Every structure is written in structure tokens, then in C-alpha cells.
């Protein structure tokens, strides 16, 4: 009986959090709300936000109020690794406000020590509940890797994407950026390789995932529609 009451109480609490974060007038995240969010709830919030974005139903926010309310601290529920592409702002495509998301951006959404350190800070120290590795269609960095481009410091960055090019074995001919299907296949593989790299190269994040403290998932943002599709096979979420 007591267990049933507790489950009902937890369900009501979860529904309350989801309602608060998806209401027409979004509230600024507090430590209490952040603590109550589970990894699966965090994913649902992002999915709901993207649906609003695609439907052009942006949440009404008082950004100046959020500036004031986050001036002494922040409690983001998610960390999103995405490309630097100007069309892929995580806060916009997931319809979130100030203090909601740690946005980590680098061309080609690749993984290195600095990226991992940023994620460890976001999750272990700041309390975020989910990591999203977000690729996007028509990615210039992926195209550069497909074409084996070389230019200054960009050469070393593209070298981190080239293993994804090699892993794409479906395409036999026209393995260049002119083949859009090839580019999109490589972009998807690159997201999945980044998920694997996070798990392998960060003992802190791997342990938090195993302990179900945080979740991780990969996804792809379609620049033509704005829709984000998540890869269920990459998900480690409770």
C-alpha cells in the first residue's frame, strides 16, 4: 500500500515538472526542479520543445526576468553537443530559455578532452540529467571530411570525422560531398561514434550513466524541417 502511494506521488511529481517546463509561460529552472528531473523526463522535455519549434509555437518567455533569476546561479537540465552551424542553436530548436541548456558547440560535433571536460562539469558539478550529441543534415564539416579537405587547423578537426567516412561501407561510388545520401550516412555514423567516444573516454560520465544519474542519446537535426530525430539505438536512459 505504502509503495503504491509512493509510486503515485512520484508520478504526480513528474507530471508537475513536465507541466511546468512545457507550460505556455516557461518558468526559470531552479535547483529543486532540476533535482526532480530524470533523464527520461529530460529527453521528453527536449522532444516536446522541438515539436513546438517545428510547429512555430514558441513558448512565451520573459527573457529579462530569466536574466535576473539566473544571475546568481544556473541549473540546466541538459547538455547538448552540436555543430557550430548558425542554424543549429540548441536553445532555439528545443524551445528552451536562459539557464535551461549547456550548449557545447564545435564543428562536426566531435569529441576531444575539452568537450569531455565541459560535459563532466555540466553533469557532475552542475547537475544536468542528459547528454545529447546532435548532428545535422548538410553538415559542412562532414562534407569536408568526405572530400578529404585540408586547410590550416581545420585539417586536424576533420581528421576526427574521417573514421566515420571509413565506417560508411554502404556507398560504393561517388563517395564525395556531392552525394547527399553519403554525407547524411557519414553524419549519422559520426554522431554514434561520438556517443561511443564519450562512454569510452570519460570514466566520470560512463559511471554516471551506469548509475542512472544521467542519460545519453544521439540525434539528427534536419535543417529543411527543423525536426530532430533521436537514435534509439544510441540511448542509455532510465
Regions found by a protein language model. Give the residues of each.
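Conserved functional hotspot residues or short segments at active or partner-binding sites
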Residues: 133
Amino acid at each position: 500500500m505504502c509503495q503504491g502511494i509512493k509510486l503515485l506521488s512520484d508520478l504526480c511529481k513528474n507530471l508537475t515538472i513536465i507541466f511546468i517546463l512545457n507550460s505556455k509561460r516557461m518558468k526559470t529552472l531552479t535547483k529543486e526542479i532540476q533535482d526532480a528531473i530524470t533523464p527520461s523526463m529530460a529527453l521528453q522535455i527536449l522532444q516536446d520543445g522541438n515539436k513546438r519549434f517545428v510547429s512555430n509555437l514558441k513558448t512565451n518567455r520573459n527573457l529579462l526576468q530569466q536574466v535576473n533569476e539566473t544571475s546568481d546561479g544556473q541549473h540546466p537540465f541538459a547538455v547538448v553537443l552540436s555543430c557550430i552551424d548558425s542554424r543549429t542553436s540548441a536553445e532555439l530548436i528545443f524551445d528552451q530559455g536562459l539557464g535551461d541548456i549547456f550548449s557545447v558547440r564545435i564543428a562536426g560535433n566531435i569529441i576531444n578532452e575539452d568537450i569531455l571536460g565541459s560535459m563532466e562539469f555540466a553533469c557532475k558539478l552542475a547537475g544536468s540529467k542528459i547528454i545529447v550529441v546532435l548532428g545535422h543534415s548538410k553538415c559542412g564539416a562532414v562534407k569536408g571530411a568526405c572530400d578529404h579537405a585540408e586547410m590550416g587547423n581545420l585539417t586536424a578537426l576533420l581528421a576526427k570525422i574521417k573514421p566515420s567516412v571509413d565506417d560508411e561501407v554502404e556507398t560504393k561510388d561517388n563517395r564525395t560531398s556531392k552525394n547527399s545520401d553519403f554525407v547524411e550516412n557519414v553524419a549519422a555514423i559520426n554522431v554514434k561514434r561520438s556517443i561511443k567516444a564519450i562512454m569510452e573516454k570519460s570514466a566520470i560520465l560512463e559511471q554516471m550513466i551506469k548509475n542512472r544519474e544521467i542519460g545519453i542519446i544521439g540525434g539528427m537535426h534536419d535543417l529543411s524541417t527543423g525536426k530532430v530525430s533521436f537514435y534509439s539505438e544510441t540511448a542509455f536512459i532510465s
